[in-house]
Amino acid sequence: TNLTDILSKVKNNRVQFLIGPVYPSHFDEVSSFCRSNGIRMIVPFSSKAKQVNVNRYVYLLNTPAEYEKILAADLFLKTFKGKSVLFLHTNKADQPDFTQYLRQRLLVQGATVVDANEDATIAQLKTALNNKRHIIVVPDASDVSALQNVFSKLSEVRQAMPKTELSLIGYSSWLNQSDRYEGELFLNDTYIFTPSYYEP
């Protein structure tokens, strides 16, 4: 039995999800087939299925953190091209790999990058932000206990700089708190990176 015969059987049986293929050499053919037929392809065996970047029917399971970091940074650079970025350093930093990697990528692209501690005064932040129109805030903590401090700091910035638009980058652990913090998440124009689903 060859791959074409197997895919023909899959199509005839109206399959909704396809787990595999096992061999990376089959990824291109199977992902194209899945796109053409509206079948979701779940790849549990490899983190190198580049098709996930261009085919909304391809899903990766067990994606290594290194690959997630690269995908998140790529998506950030595409979504927020040309925006100023504030890295907010907290006392509960648990995302240094991601924030440092993102910071390096932004600097290579010539983006305006500002670093500030969560205990910085409003005067210090106003000076650092220098009346930028739209600022993307990236905290270095995904811990929910740091979330309230981040919201408080952004509220202070919003009051002191009413003409500045703020957007917040969040982490998937925050989704568990969406009922509790729904208003603040919307107010802060929050974008949450999550490994649960990725559609470029």
Question: Model-predicted segments: where are they?
Answer:
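Short, well-ordered alpha-helical microsegments
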Residues: L3, H26-D28, Q95, I122, ...
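Glycine-rich, charge-decorated loop segments at or immediately adjacent to ligand/cofactor-binding or catalytic sites
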Residues: Q51-Y59, T121-K126, W174-N188
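Short beta-strand elements in bilobed, periplasmic/extracellular small-molecule ligand-binding domains
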Residues: T1, N55-Y57, L106-D119
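Short, well-structured alpha-helical segments in soluble
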Residues: N2-Q16, A123-N131
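Periplasmic-binding protein-like
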Residues: R14-Y23, I42-P44, S84-T90, N131-V150, ...
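Extracellular/periplasmic periplasmic-binding protein-like sensory domains
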Residues: F151-P200
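Extracytoplasmic ligand/sensor domains, especially the bilobed periplasmic-binding protein
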Residues: I19-L88, A93-L102, N176-S178
